Amino acid sequence: EPYKEDWKVVPVDGFGTQEQIRSILRSERPDILWFMTDPRFFSWLWEIENEVRPLLPMVYYHVWDNFPAPMFNRKFYLSNDVMVSISKLTDEVIKEVAPEVERHHIPHAVMNNVFRPLPEESRQKIREDSLPEEDRDKTVFFWNNRNARRKQSGTLIFWFKEFLDKHDLHDKCQLIMHTDPNDPHGQPLQHLIEKLGLGARQVLLSTQKISPENLAAVYNMADCTINISDAEGFGLATLESLSCGTPIIVNMTGGLQEQVQKNGKEFGIPIFPSSKAVIGSQQVPYIYEDRINKEHFISALNKMYQMGPNFSNFQESWANLMLSVHERHGSWDTRKGYNNIRFLEVA
């Protein structure tokens, strides 16, 4: 291993305990305590900040799904020396909740040597090796998420079925879902597939853990990656997909917003929420839940299907057409082929 003795792994249940932290501080004498994810998992750690911070700084890599700004997190934010945001939305949240805390923005990233676009012949070879002959010419939609309520896994299957019905595409499109179909926090996906009559390979389940290299191959094989979560801090799967050159369909919520649109360009199809609800729990008293509607999603699926197997080809086709139109028809001083005078026979 490249890090050798500089990298140590300590097994823990959950996210650790106060005693484990105290022991590691005494035995290893680290220079920085770095931790990340949802603040709900680290209240126990902030409880001993007065023991930790006199010795070394606490750096928290944070993501938050949505507004309103969670003022109930202020006590947690103030318990860090430095906060680093994963998404631009999170950066705005930290700024509003605890502006006095040192703040930086470092977005998620992927390994570009793994998640990268492959030549078209390589993509076709992956399809030939991974799919039976009857599936190779289908438009393949990919979904890579946890099977949980906010990820809208069941909604996706129901709406995908309606999309197939509406446009008569049962033998033209396929949805591959890489997830645990029996996750206790989600829906029984195999049951939904059977109930809706999607057992003829319209919806496939990928349930085994796979290497990053094989996952990148699936992104390259797919025509589009979907994420319609009603709350999403960032959305790593869609970032991996874009890194492989595969466009995305996403709900414009959380960190997904900054992935699909940037500098005036779109890297897929954004779907704007049609409704907002304020939900909450005992630990998270309030947060917006962004929901898209069925019609907008089915329209996005059909638009992606009409684009054909390669979004880049779609963009290139438009660029070539516009250049051709300009060459043949001109503009301003070079305008040709148009005459606004028409002669009509008058009785």
Regions of interest found by a model, annotated:
Residues D230:
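Aromatic "clamp/platform" in nucleotide-sugar-dependent glycosyltransferases that forms part
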Residues R22-F42, P57-Y60:
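Short N-terminal targeting/anchoring amphipathic segment
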Residues E289-H296, Q306-F343:
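A charged, aromatic-enriched C-terminal amphipathic alpha-helix characteristic of glycosyltransferases
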Residues L89, A109:
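Carbohydrate-associated surface elements
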Residues P247-V250, V260-Q261, F267-P270:
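Short hydrophobic beta-strand element within catalytic cores of glycosyltransferases
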Residues E133-K151, I157-F160, L175-I176:
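Conserved donor-binding/catalytic core segment of Leloir-type glycosyltransferases
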Residues P70-F72, K95, V110-P132, Q187:
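Acidic anion/phosphate-binding donor-loop and adjacent secondary structure
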Residues G186-K209, E213:
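Nucleotide-activated donor-binding/catalytic signature segment of Leloir-type glycosyltransferases, i.e.
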